[in-house]
Amino acid sequence: MKNIYWVSGLVLPFCSLQILKAEKQSNIIFIITDQQRGDALGCSGNERIITPNIDALAHDGYYFSNAYSATPSSTPARAGLLTGMTPWHHGMLGYGNVAEHYRYELPQMLSDCGYLTLGIGKMHWKPQNALHGFDATILDESGRVESPYFMSDYRKWFQTVALGKDPDETGIGWNDHAAATYKLNENLHPTVWTADVAVRTIEHYEGEKPLFLKISFARPHSPYDPPKRLLDKYQDIEMEAPIHSDWSKDIGADLTDPKADPTAAFAQFDDEYVKNSKKHYYAAITFIDEQVGRIVKALKDKGLYDNSIICFTSDHGDMMGDHHHWRKTYAYEGSSAIPYIVKFPKTLKTVKPVGTVVENPVELRDFLPTFVELAGGNVPADIDGKSLVTLVRDSLPQWRKWIDMEHATCYSEDNYWCALTDGKIKYIWFVHTGEEQLFDLVNDPKEMKDVSKERKYKKQIKDLRAAMVQHLSERGDGWVKDGKLVVRKKSMLYSPNYPQK
């Protein structure tokens, strides 16, 4: 039997099987954005950005200051979130297609624990209407159409309420570095639509089963197109100039005119142009922040806030012109560091007070074991992620030393790398060339100076190189031979662990 709820003009089927009583398990509200830098929140220490609602969530929970995306582009990052696995173990080493099915899938595992599992917004899976264990999804796929038979639910809705209008009227592409304000009524914007569906879902939630609700915003990924009223809030806020460094001084030097290549991955644009794009980007995040406020209010009005697990994160960051790089796929902080906030239910006993900043290195893979543990399920021993509960509940938590990161070739032949970081120091190995970089993030959080050749850091780079050898050794002689890292001339997009049909 199915109950039918009307959500933002769309029909959503909700399974109504009663497996477990909802009051015995906490609801899980998982909010994820697309391409949001880790420093693009007020609670990160950024005084230029306006995010009061997300900051309030951090005040009620925990802000994880050293959070990373292991493979910082959309699809492999989302595969890690879905499976709780490292890139090598879920199989995606760069930007490719999420597999149709995995042995471990977060929505299915929570469904097995008795949860109603619903996904709203951008999933970025293939096929695009795949469920991966969700009872239902309502999709906004940002204009991506990978089949002539697919149209996202947002686009269907847009056609019914804005007949004759163009949802892409702003005229900026999905990978453009330019920016402009949204040209239509802001209630037509996908950011509002995603929140509308989420709020109505919460309002109609009957509590027969505990709820896992994934709310996935397609912004602030380009197009950077906030409403003008929010851009106006930044009128008197001077944006920080893009980061320039000696090691990146020649990158993108052949391209200085933004109009010459609207989607350039490397360019040396004028600082004012970059600052304008960043201002729109920040305003787009403030737009999302407003929607987070609406979602939190709906939870409070329904009496669900206190006993819910509420998370806020992103799949990866956006370089925004730092070191003359744009978008993602890089090991540098702008691309790989992500926002990461968890508000646990009040019933969870913790040793760390709420509002604490947690410095242990965490990654998207850690959400799966966290949710499964709190849902009362069994976390498989071979899951790579670690439950975040350990970090707030235990006085002396056992935790990993490093986060491993990597990305197969993308945007340029030499952008093929593996990295290790704990948020304090970062080692990068360029797989095609054998070159190395080392950044002291404590003293140089903007990665201005590559210290890999400095005598002072000789021991650190030796130790990190050895740690990388250990990390990659399971991959065989093509990666590590005779205890040394192997330079690879051919990029590998999928590991042997990628599920075959």
Task: Please identify what each model-predicted range represents.
Residues 14-19:
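C-terminal segment of classical bacterial N-terminal signal peptides
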Residues 442:
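Residues forming the ATP-binding cleft of Hanks-type serine/threonine protein kinase domains
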Residues 2-4, 8, 20-430, 435-436, ...:
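Formylglycine-dependent sulfatase
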Residues 439:
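Extracellular C-type lectin-like domains
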Residues 10-12:
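Core hydrophobic alpha-helical transmembrane segments of single-pass membrane proteins
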